[in-house]
Amino acid sequence: LDTASPELYGPRMPRTELVENILKCFDFAVENLEDNDNSCGYINQDMALFLKSRFCLFEGTFRKYHTELNLGSTASKFLEMSRDAARLIMNKDRYHLFKNASGDAYWQLFVQKGTPELEGNEETILARVYDGVKLGHDNPRYWGMNNHTRYCMGAPVCMLEEYLCEDGRPIYIGGSEGNYEVNPLFKGYDGMWEELDNRDPRLKQTVCKPGEYASIFDMDDNTYGLEETGVIYPMITYATGGGSPMKHYNSTVTGYRFIKHWMPDYANWEANPKGVQTAHMFRYGELLLIYAEARAELGEITNEDLDITINALRERAGYDFAKYPNARLTLSNIPADPRLDAIYAQKLDYSVSPILREIRRERRVETMMEGMRYEDLMRWKAGKLFTVSVRGMKMTPEKIELYSKNRNDETYKDYPYKVTVPIGEVGNQVIVDAEGFIIPWPTSTTVINGVRPWDDKRYYYPIPLNEMLMNPELKQNPGWKDINR
């Protein structure tokens, strides 16, 4: 085809026809690519199987939940293909979850440099590797600075609340909104970042608790220098530029600074754009989640499936099954979660079984900050979850006092900028709600009081107007602007 080919100027191809052609491409690749375990060289059969499994899970669940397509009767076919492609890879016993002796394997996986084999990593199926000479990138700088030269990143409370406690139960184990029964392991929001304690071990390998990781990192020698630097508490800022100076670049919009992907290598930050942090494109951990979800959607999942998928991921993360046996997920011991169930009941137009709820939770937690959440919500027809209020940490009196320290005083030279926080009113840098939780982006005209807008038209991207001008046979997706109006 070339730009004048008539095939490019006809009406839209039906979704079913397009998808069948995509499947033919996958099957051709699987049949013709080499069957080896080279994760960063030529594309191989395992990579094609992985992509087929991921694609078929997307298409199967999209067809199941998007009833407007009238394709629900074909959803199972795609879920079965997703399941089977994943199982083919699993049966080769070629890939295994990355583990280490220090208990931080989940964090360590995402700060590797060089080929996965050199790092003792058998989890990565496809990686993008950089040498820093001919090929590099600037992500180490963005993660190291927490994107402080643009709008800063930050973890919201609604995200934190989805992480279980270390006993395998959520933070609220009974009751209803306004009268929840609290898990005894959950320390609540009234302390100094203590809500991160006693939780799924991946939480503190994703979000930095002051006193750990970036908050005590000495950029001069790439060591954790608590004695020299003290704890560098996160600066809370919304504005571009983030202020100056910003020692250790420890800024955030919510009070919770991300630590996943952050690597303690200042030289690599400054090597921009020649950073060498490995990019894991396909990994075995995601494949296990795909398999578990496909099996659950088909109504086939067993305790054995849970052990080789969800429970394997939890064990790698650091869950102590000997201390908390119920942290091991089984079909007969699925924890209650009144908070999440209430959100699903309010935001979704279908019910979610307890086991699917837990698998979706596991997927969100395990793949946090890997760019999958948006597409997951699209295929689950769960866009209204975007309207769950986004809030930052609770500004307790202790934190308000901490953030009011005068940085001109040598005693507090490494503390955050002075911040005054009249509860419920505009402070010097922080605005909080009636309960004292930070409202991110308080001047935004689209995110109002932490609530993001949603419109169902966003389940489908708009067709660019210039494409419709070139091809009048194309029709705009529902809800988006057409060339005729």
Q: What kind of feature is each model-predicted range?
A:
Residues L1, R15-E34, C40-Y65, A75-M90, ...:
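Extended, hydrophobic/aromatic-rich amphipathic alpha-helical segments that build helical scaffolds
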Residues T3-P14, M263-P273:
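Acidic/His metal-coordination segments adjacent to aromatic residues that form catalytic metal sites
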Residues Y9, N38, Y189, E270-G275, ...:
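Hydrophobic alpha-helical segments with strong N-terminal bias
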Residues V19, D46, C56-T240, L385-Y415:
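An aromatic- and glycine-enriched ligand-binding surface/loop that stacks and positions planar moieties
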Residues N21, N91, Y106-P170, G174, ...:
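Long, intrinsically disordered, low-complexity segments
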Residues D35-G41, Y95-S102, A322-Y324, E370-M372:
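Surface-exposed patches in mature extracellular/periplasmic domains of secreted proteins
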Residues W193-R316, E467-R485:
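C-terminal substrate/ligand-recognition segments
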